[in-house]
Amino acid sequence: MVNTSLLAALTAYAVAVSAAPTAPQVKGFSVNQVAVPKGVYRHPAAQLAKAYGKYHATVPTQVAAAAAATGSVTTNPTSNDEEYITQVTVGDDTLGLDFDTGSADLWVFSSQTPSSERSGHDYYTPGSSAQKIDGATWSISYGDGSSASGDVYKDKVTVGGVSYDSQAVESAEKVSSEFTQDTANDGLLGLAFSSINTVQPTPQKTFFDNVKSSLSEPIFAVALKHNAPGVYDFGYTDSSKYTGSITYTDVDNSQGFWGFTADGYSIGSDSSSDSITGIADTGTTLLLLDDSIVDAYYEQVNGASYDSSQGGYVFPSSASLPDFSVTIGDYTATVPGEYISFADVGNGQTFGGIQSNSGIGFSIFGDVFLKSQYVVFDASGPRLGFAAQA
């Protein structure tokens, strides 16, 4: 059963209802991301390694080597976007979670996680409202070496004032260093399709799948921001956050992702009618494309080159970058060139926000792309909607 208790700040978008035998209807709600301090410096190639690992692609040796570089913060902290998380209440605990449309698990650091692995993290302690699911386990392991696993509980989870009392919460017993070092994130809230949830022997539903019947529309919309916290709208679209109309395209969810096909693309003034098949993934930082497109993009950037020591394309920090656009039906979604300037790697060089998808088999439209768009994830189609941010 879904119980709702709407925050005062959200009353313009939601209607408080009392518990009922069926899921109560609410207009919708919004949750804002929160900026968090940067931790230990991580080379931008770590974002590449993370994405390759997430989709079980081999992490190239040069990417792995560059990603392993650590040390004091030597980059300009405004040269790439801050890290943003969203506050979620799990049981009696408030955690900072990464909302990820590229996965379908809600997993958290917990009191079951060894103290040495949860240091610096807020964590979930199963309390009186928690019910352990006997025999249920979960496990994730990625090609970059990151992994986590543990037990599963049913507990109350609250996002933006809307609660679900029996949400599957994957409590971490083991967490690899790739996750423990990121003290900004206390876990992940997956928003992909429940078909790829990793709980065994019985996969569990995502938070969105559990609450979508209580919303006026089974949708959520994402307005990530460049160098600023973004917002997630659940159950409605906010016309103040986009310009023009929303263009929709069918979703291929056969692999559990929000997959779609762009009809063509442009680099600056040069256009191509070649289509791009990819997924919309808020949990991936970069825009990862086929090598031919990546090469073509950086051919238009003076001084750009693939630097194996950096694990990707770099260019002079003073270089002017062309816009990158994709065509979706009659709509052109444009990523401003400045968004593709991702991170300073020293010696006057910048790591690009467009990089290779390493033969994953599809492109990944990560945050570099999404931060220019208002994107609607509509479960009723399923379909995706795109409009330029206001």
From Swiss-Prot:
Glycan attachment positions: 70
Propeptide residues per the UniProt entry: 20-67
Signal sequence annotation: 1-19
Control of this protein's activity: Inhibited by the microbial peptide pepstatin.
Organism: Aspergillus oryzae
Gene Ontology molecular-function annotations: aspartic-type endopeptidase activity
One annotated GO biological process: proteolysis
Keywords for the protein's UniProt record, in alphabetical order: Aspartyl protease, Glycoprotein, Hydrolase, Protease, Secreted, Signal
Record EC number: 3.4.23.18
Protein's name in the database: Aspergillopepsin-1
GO cellular component: extracellular region
Catalytic activity from the UniProt record: Hydrolysis of proteins with broad specificity. Generally favors hydrophobic residues in P1 and P1', but also accepts Lys in P1, which leads to activation of trypsinogen. Does not clot milk
